[in-house]
Amino acid sequence: MKNRRTLTFEQARGPNARRRTCGRFFAAVLSAAVSSGILLAQGATPAAAQSAVELPVAFQVKNTNTSPASCSSGLADGATYTIRGHISGPPAALASGKAELVTIYLFGYEAGEWNWDLKGVPGYDYASEVAKKGQVSLTLDELGYGASGHPANGNETCEGAEADITHQIIQKLRHGEYTLPESPTIEFSNVVLAGHDVGGEVAEVEAYSYKDIDGLILVSFADQGFTPYITETETHAAFQTCTESASGYAHLISDEEFRTVPFYNTDPRVIEATAALRNTNPCGIIRSAPATLVPDHALAPQIKVPVLIVFGENDQLVTSRQGQEEEEGVFSGSPDKKTVFIRDAGHFVMFSRTAEVFTRP
């Protein structure tokens, strides 16, 4: 097996990476999003600290792909699976059978639900922290990851299928058609969809395919400007690592790369905690990601809801700064869009030491 060169963060970024400071923090971005319509004011209580609860939740879904983003390595198997996660929020917001707003958080390669609710290192459980500020979140393990169902072969799903499954979950959230073991289900009037890394691409596909969300947030994802590093990495994983995987599940990068390349200004405890939780990826997702860019560019202009785009200012791992700055233009049909660069943060924006800004009023 030919070994692919392992790069440090600085090598992956390249010598021409530029530094740009933006003083607007992520929590301030969310506040701005409230006023611009991405997050509805009725669904968020002002910043006074509140208590938070986390409720285990399960959704029954079918692994189908009715989106325009085709599966590249085989068809979705059409089977029924359980998607598991948690709804987090202030007790008052979850006390009745109806609530105003929930934000669904999707993740990218190598990750899992922990991307948005990391336990064990204080201050990095994003869902819990924003719950204390009045926001309701759904974090989950997507199909093929963590505690959720896994197709027998990881080639039997793809980004389009993950978007379809997300659409199913959104409809179930709106109608209370899911399982909360210890309490009645809640019907949510408004749903915002957020995604990190290729979870952002899945969120984008969901948005233009089904047009059933009230706002879209992309974190560390752009549809253009891909670096030589990520092009080589994706190609190697799709055509070599996945080809050699009998199960159809594979890591995108090595353990050494995971511990160095996507992190910037990060507490070593966070790196160790996330490395211990790292998941393999369904190869159908790895193989479908590049091809999904075609419908992205063709159909993203159909997205009419507000769009918030977030990057770490020190993240040029996957896309160039030019590609990041051009992302707003992909959403020409949205009447309200904004791009924000987070100071001293890398690809895993939520795990940089500036993560405290996520919950700052």
Regions found by a protein language model. Name each.
Residues 94-135:
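Short, surface-exposed "cap/lid" segments of acyl-processing enzymes
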Residues 156-185:
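Alpha/beta-hydrolase active-site loop
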Residues 181-197:
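Alpha/beta-hydrolase fold nucleophile elbow
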Residues 219-299:
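Accessory cap/linker subdomain of secreted extracellular hydrolases
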Residues 303, 309-311, 315:
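Short beta-strand/loop motif that positions the catalytic acidic residue
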